[in-house]
Curated annotation (Swiss-Prot):
Natural source organism: Picosynechococcus sp. (strain ATCC 27264 / PCC 7002 / PR-6)
Purpose of the protein: Catalyzes the conversion of 4-hydroxy-tetrahydrodipicolinate (HTPA) to tetrahydrodipicolinate.
Record protein name field: 4-hydroxy-tetrahydrodipicolinate reductase
GO biological process: diaminopimelate biosynthetic process; lysine biosynthetic process via diaminopimelate
Residues binding (S)-2,3,4,5-tetrahydrodipicolinate: H165, G174, T175
Amino acid sequence: MENINKIPVVINGAGGKMGREVVKAVAGAADMEIIAAVDKNPALLGQDAGEIAGCGAVEVPIVNDLEASLVMATQSKIQGVMVDFTHPSGVYANTRAAIAYGVRPVVGTTGLSEEQINDLKEFAEKASTGALIIPNFSIGVVLLQQASLQAAKYFDHVEIIELHHNQKADAPSGTAIKTAQMLAELGKQFNPAEVEEKEEMPGAKGAVTEDNIRIHSVRLPGLIAHQEMIFGAPGQIYTLRHDTSDRSCYMPGVLLSIRKVTELNTLVYGLENIL
């Protein structure tokens, strides 16, 4: 039975690797309650979300009906939150649906375009509904990005290498794109050409942003999530790197985001903006 003093949480993508971690984290949070767990995997339907996650029964079966779950979240005295870890192909529609129902989305799924993010921000503002899009929930990644901003003031050459498991659908990663955007806000042009460049194979030197920052994506089994920032100057190389060894590292950021989104009335992009 729903506790009126707890934040009601809908977990979309509850059967995935990140979704299962979210189930465990929310189930263990004293101020939150899982009211719905959604997943499209037919093999999981009807099973207890907690049992699937490995944290014991939470008495919430996995369903494949996001709309009904959002309706359930609107019936609480405390405004509900939807956490989305699904797929790039569906995240825009999921997020827009949550806002339309007055349920505050916390989006960890990457792959949203800049145009889609701007549209969702406008939609959230019109609805006066808080929303969070977080490319990476790790506090360590926020520190990597902040250190990169400091380094970029003194280095004109930088490349980003992001490495993920081979089941990640989008490339570059949302974290790499966000990091490049943060560097671009410094207002400088990176990687001035020293020679006339020629790629024998298109894309050999990585994807290039408008500010001439190169991003390289690696997808291999055995990886989880990693990002390396390589800064270069005559006579020196400065390297920053963050490695994720377990998805549990994201959960403090997820729980913080669930709590913070209830205080917002617009869309915020990036964990660093709510810390």
